[in-house]
Amino acid sequence: MNALQCKDYAVYVGADISKNTINLSYHSKDNLVNTQIANDTRAIKKFIKEIKELNETHLHFILEATGSYSRTLYTTLRDLKIRFTQVNPRFTYAFARSRGVLDKTDKIDAQLLEDYGRRMTPAATIPDEDIQIELKNLYMLRIALIKEKREWKQRSHHHKQGTEKRIIERMAKAIEKEIDMLDEEIQKKIQSQEMNNKLYEAMLEITGVGAASASAIICLLPEIGTLNSNQISKLAGVAPMLQQSGTSIHKTAHITGGRKHLRTALYMPCMSACVSNPVIRAHFQKIRESKGGANVKGAGAIALVACMRKLLKHINSEARKVREEMQRHVAVEGYGEAAQASPCR
């Protein structure tokens, strides 16, 4: 994840978030303090003001990624410019087991998050802009509507005629119309932001990548072009991870973790690239043959994942060029404005 190191921050605040409340845990003058506040902006700001009055000015919140429930705390901390880290729940689960903690309550979870922050000193998350949060939310809504549309179409197979059939068909068409409207809204938001628009146009230049795939990458992978190839592959969940221990040292690596919906979005452009992109096609054939050829079960799937990784690395490389070009352009503009404003020329 794109992040900044912040080990100099002294007070870590563990925040366990639920629908209506936030349980908080932090150390103040060597004493562990536990409290609970409402999950709304006013209560969060009040808590931060009170804790700062105790001279606890260096704050670093530790919270798990809990979807929409964490949105209020996320945006409030971002607007107040207070550092925080969104931790993968898998990491905190493993940390709890390593500490021998088997009980699970909101209070204990907040204490574990605070303990995790002090011991692991995680990097601070660089918060997304409002436009990026909106894009992700819109795309996740699109995924939900596609799933619902598929379910309605499956129901239509069991109703061949009559009122039930007509209602089901109307529902499927209505959902399809909403999906089209969502696609238009996503396109407008991408085009409204210069960086996203240039990234989108650069992706369309790559053989095999279409409008839907480019939109998905921008919505679900805002880190594109800011990380190296290995990091971006792991983030997408297409990097081979070794599982070797004891006598199992000869077992092959497998993909694990990553962003599931992003992998799904990469599948179709990769299939297209395997046909139309000569570099990806040659890579697919090479990997498949190395795994035993077309007649060996699973060889094609392994080759396809390898091609997804290669395609994503290429997209990441092109996105990095776009970002570097934008930075140079901004730097040149800034230099020109400074030169014009200078009295000594």
Regions found by a protein language model. Name each.
Residues 30-60:
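Nucleic-acid-processing active sites and adjacent nucleic-acid-binding tracks
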Residues 2-27, 113:
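Gly/Thr-rich phosphate-binding beta-strand-loop-beta motif of the actin/hexokinase/Hsp70
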Residues 85-206:
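Long, charge-rich intrinsically disordered scaffolds of nucleic-acid metabolism proteins
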Residues 247, 284-345:
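Low-complexity, acidic/Ser/Thr- and charged residue-rich accessory regions of DNA metabolism proteins
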Residues 19, 67, 91:
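Short, glycine/acidic-enriched loop or turn micro-motifs at the edges of active sites
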Residues 62-73:
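Acidic, metal-coordinating catalytic cores used for nucleic-acid/nucleotide bond scission
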Residues 211, 217-300:
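Phosphate-backbone recognition surface of nucleic-acid-processing proteins
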